[in-house]
């Protein structure tokens, strides 16, 4: 099966290139990118089974979403791995990373294997995060070694801030030992009067307490300092801070 994708605008992140070209695909594998003259015969003379006109469209490698909520297991009335994967594929995403805030939480190898095995039945690559703390309670670490060996790619209590500095430090030390990244939900709930609105002129006018930026500053600063101390790899996955503000702490 030979397919010619014509007139597409190619985005090539690996080579930091962006250009217009035709792509020849043979049996599902790219065999040629025709920008000026990559073949000894004109493009129009190449025998193909299918021609796709991509004029005005972007042609790129499969996109990767490192933070998805497929709600499976436990909340499949919202979404499940099959429907989530289908939606991802329709949008050009060929690889996704599911968060661990399911029911049961992905804090054990059995639930992790459920997600991974069900993901293998879909047309895309479905990976899973695992919880930092058991039950997302922020009190005791999960078995990082077992979860890494089971296929987890990152540890996160997504959606739940970790309040204990000592637990965070312990998690970073273990993650560093295993060469695994951590991802944090950066808000200090003790400093937030009302979720859903930033603390500022509008919240004051509406007489709603709001969530001040400082509730995020302090958590980002804390975790960056602990990461510097432990040499752990971390990601700030949830923040509303502006780049120039966050930069003061990163």
Where in this protein do the model-derived segments appear?
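Metal-associated gating/positioning segment near the N- to mid-region
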Residues: 54-119
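Active-site gating loops and adjacent loop-to-helix segments of metal-dependent hydrolytic enzymes
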Residues: 91-93, 116-125, 187-230
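N-terminal metal-binding scaffold of metallo-dependent hydrolase/deaminase domains
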Residues: 1-45
